[in-house]
């Protein structure tokens, strides 16, 4: 009997590669859609009989799920974020958890962050809309600044944040400062980046702030009202990390007061959004639908990680990207 793989709520896994057919050479593979807020018990019942889960950003996999489903032996995230998986509960119940190593989507996300940065700074979307409405003569209102002349603050200096900083320093010659209490200052300075000691300090010194921190209790709404109201007036905010890093209500207030001059987001707190999403009323807000990692190169690398992880599990080989490896792991029972 073959092991079973559930691809849950992922529309991109295998879309541009032969990942599904490769898995099917050794496993039974099913695409499963569930509501993003499905209950843990209902989710556990839906996935009875599946041994491997290819997980997207939804739904959540918490204690109740692991307690109620004894079949799953490994969850593999089709991405690098793990905030929808209770890692402690997974370990407690003997379930391995794997995430795509950050380097697999580093270039894609970093490039998108810079693209959003330039779009917000140069008001590309607004200018395009103006032309489409016959406003070619309104060019003067889109006079902007050179990115090379500005200070960019990077929040989170890990795999992606450090690459964004490198692009800005070497490609544009921007002054870059960074805040990350978990990274040695020497690593920042080696890239020509100036470390700062707090979010408030970073906000006060930056013309543009780009978010690249992982989501945790410490970083939840790290850009709050205090941080926003301490910002240099006219600051631009870019977020390609997690929507929960930003306090949406405080951001709207900062936009209304002119403290924030433009925003470019690839993520929001509750995805997906509809036409009633509050920030859509602002012409100086650009939002893309969580596509920073959506390049063929990144998706191919992510698919490869997932196939390799499942095959290596079956072959009892080391698994790249493993973040939870319980001492007493569940056994695969066919």
For the regions a language model picked out, list residue spans one by one.
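N-terminal glycine-/charge-rich "phosphate-binding" loop or analogous flexible N-terminal tail
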Residues: 1-52, 186, 314, 330-334
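C-terminal helix-to-coil terminal segments
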Residues: 2, 91, 99-110, 269-334
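Phosphate-coordination loops involved in phosphoryl transfer and adenosine-cofactor binding
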Residues: 2, 72, 148-151, 225, ...
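Short, conserved active-site loop motifs that form the nucleotide-linked donor/cofactor pocket
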Residues: 27, 95, 193-194, 284-286
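Rossmann-like adenosine-cofactor binding region
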Residues: 48, 61-65, 174, 181-278, ...
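Phosphate/diphosphate ligand-binding glycine-rich loop within oxidoreductases
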Residues: 50-128, 237
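Glycine-rich NAD(P)-binding loop of Rossmann-like domains
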Residues: 104, 128-163
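Gly/Ala-rich phosphate-binding loop of Rossmann-like dinucleotide-binding domains
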Residues: 165, 169, 256
């Amino acid at each position: 009997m073959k092991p079973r793989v559930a691809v849950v709520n992922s529309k991109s896994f295998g879309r541009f590669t032969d990942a599904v057919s490769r898995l099917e050479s050794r496993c039974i593979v099913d695409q499963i859609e569930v509501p993003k807020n499905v209950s843990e018990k209902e989710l556990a019942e839906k996935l009875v009989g599946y041994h491997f889960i290819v997980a997207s950003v939804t739904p959540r996999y918490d204690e109740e799920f692991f307690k109620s489903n004894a079949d799953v032996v490994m969850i593999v995230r089709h991405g690098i974020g793990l905030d929808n998986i209770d890692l402690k509960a997974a370990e407690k119940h003997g379930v391995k958890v794997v995430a795509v190593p950050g380097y697999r989507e580093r270039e894609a996300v970093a490039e998108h962050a810079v693209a959003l940065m330039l779009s917000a700074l140069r008001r590309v979307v607004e200018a395009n809309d103006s032309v489409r409405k016959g406003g070619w003569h309104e060019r003067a209102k889109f006079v902007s600044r050179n990115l090379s002349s500005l200070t960019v603050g990077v929040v989170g200096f890990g795999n992606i944040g450090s690459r964004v900083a490198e692009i800005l320093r070497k490609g544009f010659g921007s002054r870059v400062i960074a805040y990350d209490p978990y990274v040695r200052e020497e690593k920042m300075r080696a890239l020509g980046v100036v470390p700062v000691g707090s979010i408030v300090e970073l906000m006060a010194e930056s013309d543009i702030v780009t978010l690249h921190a992982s989501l945790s209790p410490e970083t939840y709404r790290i850009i709050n009202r205090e941080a926003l109201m301490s910002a240099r007036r006219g600051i631009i905010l870019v977020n390609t990390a997690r929507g929960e890093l930003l306090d949406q209500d405080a951001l709207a207030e900062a936009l209304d007061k002119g403290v924030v001059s433009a925003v470019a987001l690839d993520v929001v707190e509750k995805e997906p959004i509809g036409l009633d999403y509050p920030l859509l009323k602002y012409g100086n807000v650009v939002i893309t639908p969580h596509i920073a990692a959506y390049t063929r190169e990144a998706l191919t690398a992510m698919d490869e990680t997932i196939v390799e992880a499942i095959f290596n599990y079956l072959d009892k080989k080391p698994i790249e990207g493993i973040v939870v490896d319980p001492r007493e792991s569940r056994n695969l029972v066919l």
